[in-house]
């Protein structure tokens, strides 16, 4: 407990912003011992933050570009007053709240990858700058009783807070364009989601998708 609350944060705040190849090597040597599992040739640029890395499996040849935040669910998460709508994803095959990243993956700069509901990123996936992936977020009403007044921030303790838990899977070869937001579902193999799109549901294999909500407009590859 002391390690998680005091020692680890101190070490991470010190090594986080060391620039260049030296910083990458230091962060790799540190985090490969903190991840649940970790491959080789993992590059972690300056400013990257990992929250609950012990619930993350990281493959080989993975590059985390600067100033991204990757967070899994901590074991002590307080969900007591949360009304959680759980959205099923049949492609999701790891524990809720965990993150698994495959091989040959590039995570763009200023990404937010929030794995409270669970995220699987398969091999050869690319996320461009400022991509946001939220597998657990607040919801505008209670799915079981839409007449009930609910709230949308975790500081509310005396009333109900409505949430949605939506595990996310990015299949092999997926590319998310600049500023894409993913809020749920499975993105099919070799699909591309265009800049500024918002994805809230499944996307079939080999899709070229755009819009809010994002829809397939054509095949990516002929």
Regions found by a protein language model. Give the residues of each.
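A generic "structured core" feature
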Residues: 175, 181-182, 188, 192-199, ...
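A short, acidic, flexible beta-alpha connecting loop/helix-capping segment that sits on the rim
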Residues: 197, 213-215
């Amino acid at each position: 407990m002391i390690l998680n609350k005091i020692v680890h944060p101190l070490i991470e705040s010190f090594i986080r912003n060391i620039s260049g190849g030296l910083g990458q090597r230091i962060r790799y040597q540190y985090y490969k011992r903190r991840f649940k599992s970790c491959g080789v040739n993992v590059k972690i640029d300056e400013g990257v933050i990992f929250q609950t890395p012990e619930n993350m499996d990281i493959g080989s040849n993975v590059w985390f570009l600067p100033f991204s935040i990757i967070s899994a669910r901590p074991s002590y998460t307080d969900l007591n007053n949360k009304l959680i709508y759980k959205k099923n994803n049949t492609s999701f095959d790891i524990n809720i709240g965990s993150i698994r990243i495959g091989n040959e993956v590039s995570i763009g700069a200023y990404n937010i990858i929030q794995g409270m509901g669970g995220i699987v990123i398969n091999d050869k996936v690319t996320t461009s700058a400022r991509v946001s992936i939220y597998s657990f977020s607040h919801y505008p009403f209670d799915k079981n009783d839409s007449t009930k007044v609910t709230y949308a921030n975790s500081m509310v303790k005396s009333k109900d807070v409505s949430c949605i838990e939506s595990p996310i899977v990015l299949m092999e070869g997926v590319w998310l364009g600049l500023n894409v937001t993913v809020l749920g579902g499975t993105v099919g193999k070799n699909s591309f989601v265009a800049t500024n799109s918002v994805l809230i549901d499944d996307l079939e294999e080999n899709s070229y998708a755009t819009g809010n909500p994002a829809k397939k407009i054509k095949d990516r590859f002929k």
